[in-house]
Design a protein with these regions (language model features):
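A short, amphipathic edge element
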Residues: 131-153
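Exposed beta-sheet edge and beta->alpha loop/turn motif
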Residues: 1-25, 42, 149-217
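Core segments of small alpha/beta cavity-forming domains
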Residues: 56-136
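A short linear-motif detector with a strong N-terminal bias
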Residues: 78, 119-126, 143-144, 172-176, ...
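Juxtamembrane and targeting peptides
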Residues: 2-87
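A broad structural signal for short, well-ordered beta-strand segments within beta-sheet-rich domains
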Residues: 45, 142-143, 206
Length: 217
């Protein structure tokens, strides 16, 4: 969902905070906490945000990574059924949202197969963002279950015991910081998610994934 997001400012796709606004007036602006009087970096400010010594803007305390709860896999998602595959795919989306909001990709890694393109691309981009920034307010909502069906090994080239799960939903990239630039993408966008969920070693794991926006459909 966020594959090119962190490169947006550098490429000129989105304006940084303080430049010509592109966000609707109804969008809630990012919180801008004042620095502590005892802070050694209180003189270093950018757009109302305090700058820490490494040059990155300070993340608002009320949106700290610690305010996000790590997702838990539902018990029914541990069952070798189509419903189990569906719930495991929804959990996967929860772990991806958690990764963007916290920088912790481990739950997402645990539910996806190493080497798979969707998995590796998102892990790379989350790590790149948190090497020089942060994000909060990222969220994904499933609005419709399009299909949950067994996937043919012959037709799709998938592994045995694979269920294809397709969701319609919305995604919101929230507020991100890249270095000293704030990127406000706090708006819902319609998307379609598709996952190959494979039953392996006693549990569901994603062996393929994709997300399409309206322009890509």
């Amino acid at each position: 969902v966020f594959a090119v997001y962190i490169n947006g400012v550098a490429e000129g796709w989105w304006h940084a905070w303080g430049e010509k606004p592109t966000v609707a007036a109804t969008t809630t602006p990012a919180a801008r906490p004042a620095p502590s009087a005892s802070s050694p970096t209180e003189a270093a400010m950018s757009g109302g945000y305090q700058i820490v010594p490494d040059g990155v803007l300070v993340r608002p305390t009320e949106h700290a990574a610690s305010t996000y709860t790590k997702p838990e896999l539902p018990e029914e998602a541990k069952e070798n059924t189509e419903r189990g595959a569906e719930l495991a795919a929804e959990y996967l989306l929860d772990t991806l949202t958690y990764a963007w909001n916290t920088g912790d990709t481990q739950p997402f890694e645990d539910i996806t197969q190493p080497g798979e393109k969707f998995r590796e691309g998102h892990i790379k981009n989350v790590n790149a963002l948190y090497a020089n920034g942060w994000m909060y307010g990222n969220k994904t909502t499933v609005t419709n279950i399009v299909s949950v069906l067994p996937a043919s090994e012959k037709e799709w080239g998938v592994e045995p015991n694979t269920i294809a799960v397709v969701f319609d939903g919305t995604t919101n990239n929230g507020i991100a910081c890249v270095g000293q630039k704030i990127i406000d993408k706090n708006s819902d966008e319609p998307v379609t998610y598709a996952f190959f969920m494979t039953w392996k070693n006693g549990g569901w794991i994603s062996t393929g994934g994709s997300v399409l926006n309206n322009e890509q459909k």
